[in-house]
């Protein structure tokens, strides 16, 4: 048997294809017409276009490989038994197998080259002397998490890919690593065959979908799976090649396992011939034991292909990631008083995730300064959001916040603690609504609503309420056109279903909430005939791969984490708080009254280990329920409050309140003793938060630290690793690790679900 192998980028050279262009003039003319330039001049004339530029390299190699193949078949009168290609060369292998003709293949390659040629800021390097497992271990050990394995060229030649700066860091690491014979940076502009090609892949996927492919006449070995292409997954597999590892070693081992196999390199150079020679010397063949049940084996093989496509980047909704320019379907929620800091938001954005700056409890100036800082750090297309917490008592503060967000062109808002849609949210949506060229209504000001109740979800899944539109029209705050367009779209682009979580919580259970909310979403989309899907995310309790996997299996289009981010370097809270959080376990939280909604009895989940806050906060709420005023408390209780809880007199507290609260509130307190008591008790909640954030030594036991069990689970997960110490925890690295290990876990669980019933079915062995 014989396999024809086709080289990829790196094999190009000036002068290649000489003689072939004249021999196949009709195809050369066809190529010139498709490309818009002379393919012969590109390949043979030094003063013409640069054949080493990706945009030109790929079409040039494809054409030369294709013409070389036609000449080989004419000369030998024989077609191959198998075909394979390295990266770009795979298109020639598919052409040889009859999947498409010369013209179609060239159009695909032209588009691929254009997309990859636009990628900048990336780098690649070959590591000689280490196995893939050893290379991966070195990357993990030195926290080079932004680097991927791009090519497995031979057992001892591994190509890595990632941001150029990260590749430069890796050079120093590998050159000082035992057994590394050579670290060779490649002359490329992009991080090819890595997660950083995901956006280009999505565009290519849409492009390739318009083409029709014919049945394969011979098996073509896929770079992605190191196994033959499946006809019904041909387009998907070809697209996946762009951001996945080229498994060349295992591809050749698979072919070696077919029996006596001859390899012939078709195209310029002998790069693949050299790689195959080394693989034969350094590795053994792979084979499959004959299958007992072809139907079952085919099903299992298909499942394996599906599983192999599970990566950190593939989890969640592709449309969601595309809309927000994300690599990962991973968000980090806003945390009170800027604990979800500008540093946190920037770090996540640069890593292909999205964070929300926590505005609760901050002044407008503090929020605006943070927005300017974030915008100054991030470039176009890097996503960030601002958290907007509903203020039931002071809606005017929401008005001012929306004015600020609109003024600073903040286009993504996380709406938290809203019990329904409000006029300020309607106004925010109105100022970004328009029709695109296709006539679809789109909104540049996006809302992601965090919800935990179906009735709240329904209000955000519905168009803006008519009474609010009329009110805003009457106040000249929106236009007639804006009102008309708002009637066509939901109030929220996406909703995030929040199960039991740190901070404000309804104590919901994800297993019950997610199915109910996704069904409601489907019902509302049908009711209002929305054209664009509303995505449903999951939050609350997510701190381990198991929890994240459960969320995605329940249908989450994205996940949102909270508590685990509070115990990181980027969190804007005190080291003392982080020290306490690092020690907590899943049972170390409790529920306490929410300071901002004290009178209603709303709850927040807080840390209880090492502090008295939850017990003291609950005591205050108990007193508020039992008594009508501070004066009704006995002397002993008053003394306890002043000495143990407040560390100051009731009189001093009230003076402080009078300085900071609106005059209307103080006037009401003077007339209503119950309201005055509520203001005094609520002072303790602000006080306890400030103690924690500042790390005050004055009264550590009064620290109010919003937190859920997810952090306890996270602590157990990373116990014994570098991440056990919070000083080694960075939000971006945590996010990537969580998503990566979730993908691995999901892959393993899928494998176990589809494990063959016969030991001889589809088992890879060495021979």
Curated annotation (Swiss-Prot):
Localization in the cell: Cytoplasm
Residues annotated as transmembrane: none
Enzyme class: transferase
Any one cellular-component term (Gene Ontology): cytosol
Start and end residues of each stretch annotated as Acyl transferase: 1-312
Active site: 87, 193
Keyword Transferase found: yes
Catalytic activity entry: holo-[ACP] + malonyl-CoA = malonyl-[ACP] + CoA
Name this protein carries in UniProt: Polyketide biosynthesis protein PksE
Family of the protein in this entry: In the N-terminal section; belongs to the FabD family.
Pathway assigned in UniProt: Antibiotic biosynthesis; bacillaene biosynthesis
Keyword 4Fe-4S among UniProt keywords: no
Native source organism of the sequence: Bacillus subtilis (strain 168)
EC number: 2.3.1.39
GO BP: antibiotic biosynthetic process; fatty acid biosynthetic process
GO MF annotation list: [acyl-carrier-protein] S-malonyltransferase activity
UniProt keywords, alphabetically: Acyltransferase, Antibiotic biosynthesis, Cytoplasm, Transferase
Function, in words: Probably involved in some intermediate steps for the synthesis of the antibiotic polyketide bacillaene which is involved in secondary metabolism. Probably has an acyl transferase activity and could also have a flavin mononucleotide-dependent oxidoreductase activity.
């Amino acid at each position: 048997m014989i396999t024809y192998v086709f080289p990829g980028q790196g094999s190009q050279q000036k002068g290649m294809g000489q003689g072939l262009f004249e021999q196949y003039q009709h195809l050369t003319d066809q190529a010139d017409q498709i490309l818009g330039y002379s393919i012969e001049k590109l390949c043979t004339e030094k003063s013409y276009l640069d054949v080493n530029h990706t945009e030109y390299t790929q079409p040039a190699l494809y054409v030369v490989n294709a013409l070389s193949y036609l000449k080989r078949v004419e000369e030998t009168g024989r077609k191959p038994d198998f075909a394979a290609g390295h990266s770009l060369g795979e298109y020639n292998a598919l052409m040889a197998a009859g999947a498409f003709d010369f013209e179609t293949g060239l159009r695909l390659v032209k588009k691929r080259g254009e997309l990859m040629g636009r990628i900048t800021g990336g780098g690649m390097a070959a590591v000689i002397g280490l196995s893939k497992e050893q290379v991966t271990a070195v990357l993990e050990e030195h926290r080079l998490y932004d680097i991927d394995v791009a090519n497995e060229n031979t057992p001892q030649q591994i190509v890595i890919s990632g941001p150029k700066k990260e590749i430069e860091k890796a050079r120093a690491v590998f050159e000082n690593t035992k057994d590394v014979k050579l670290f060779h940076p490649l002359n490329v502009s992009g991080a090819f065959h890595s997660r950083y090609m995901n956006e280009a892949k999505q565009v290519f996927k849409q492009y390739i979908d318009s083409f029709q492919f014919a049945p394969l006449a011979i098996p073509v070995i896929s770079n992605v799976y190191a196994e033959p292409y499946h006809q019904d997954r041909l387009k998907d597999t070809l697209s996946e090649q762009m951001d996945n590892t080229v498994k060349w070693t295992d591809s050749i081992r698979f072919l070696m396992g077919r029996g006596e196999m001859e390899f012939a390199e078709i195209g310029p150079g002998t790069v693949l011939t050299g790689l195959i020679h080394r693989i034969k010397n350094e590795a053994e063949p792979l084979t499959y034991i004959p299958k007992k049940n072809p139907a079952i084996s085919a099903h299992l093989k298909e499942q394996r292909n599906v599983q192999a496509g599970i990566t950190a980047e593939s989890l969640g909704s592709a449309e969601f990631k595309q809309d927000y320019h994300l690599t990962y379907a991973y968000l980090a929620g806003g945390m009170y008083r800027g604990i979800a800091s500008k540093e946190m938001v920037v770090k996540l954005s640069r890593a292909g995730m999205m964070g929300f700056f926590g505005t609760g409890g901050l002044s407008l100036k503090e929020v605006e300064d943070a927005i300017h800082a974030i915008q100054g750090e991030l470039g176009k297309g890097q996503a960030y959001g601002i958290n907007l917490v509903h203020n039931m008592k002071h809606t005017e503060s929401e008005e001012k916040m929306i004015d600020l967000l609109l003024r600073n062109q903040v286009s993504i808002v996380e709406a938290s603690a809203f019990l329904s849609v409000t006029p300020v949210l309607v106004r925010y949506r109105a100022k970004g609504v328009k029709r695109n060229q296709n006539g679809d209504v789109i909104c540049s000001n996006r809302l992601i609503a965090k919800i935990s109740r179906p009735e709240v979800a329904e209000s955000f899944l519905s168009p803006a309420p008519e009474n609010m539109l009329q009110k805003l029209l009457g106040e000249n705050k929106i236009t007639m056109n804006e009102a008309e367009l708002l009637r066509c779209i939901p109030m929220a682009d996406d909703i995030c279903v929040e199960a039991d979580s740190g901070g404000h919580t309804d104590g919901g259970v994800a297993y019950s909430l997610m199915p109910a909310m996704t069904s409601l979403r489907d019902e509302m989309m049908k009711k209002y005939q929305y054209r664009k899907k509303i995505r449903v995310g999951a939050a609350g309790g997510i701190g381990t791969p198991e929890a994240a996997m459960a969320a995605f299996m329940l249908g989450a289009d994205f996940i949102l984490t909270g508590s685990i981010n509070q115990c990181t370097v980027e969190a804007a809270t005190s080291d003392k708080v982080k020290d306490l959080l690092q020690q907590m376990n899943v049972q170390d939280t409790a529920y306490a009254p929410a300071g901002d909604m004290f009178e209603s009895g709303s709850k927040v989940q807080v840390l209880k280990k090492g502090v008295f806050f939850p017990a003291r906060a609950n005591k205050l709420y108990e007193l508020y329920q039992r008594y009508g005023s501070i004066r009704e408390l006995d002397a002993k209780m008053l003394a306890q409050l002043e000495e143990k809880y407040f560390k100051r007199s009731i009189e001093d507290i009230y003076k402080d309140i009078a300085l900071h609260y609106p005059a209307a509130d103080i006037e009401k307190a003077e007339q209503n003793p119950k309201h005055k008591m509520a203001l005094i008790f609520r002072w303790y909640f602000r006080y306890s938060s400030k103690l924690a954030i500042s790390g005050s030594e004055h009264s550590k036991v009064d620290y109010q630290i919003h937190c859920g069990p997810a952090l306890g689970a996270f602590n157990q997960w990373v116990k014994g690793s570098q991440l056990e110490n919070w000083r080694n925890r960075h939000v971006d690295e945590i996010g990537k690790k969580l998503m990566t290990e979730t993908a691995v876990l999901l892959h393993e669980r899928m494998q176990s679900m589809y494990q063959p019933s016969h030991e001889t079915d589809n088992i890879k062995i060495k021979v």
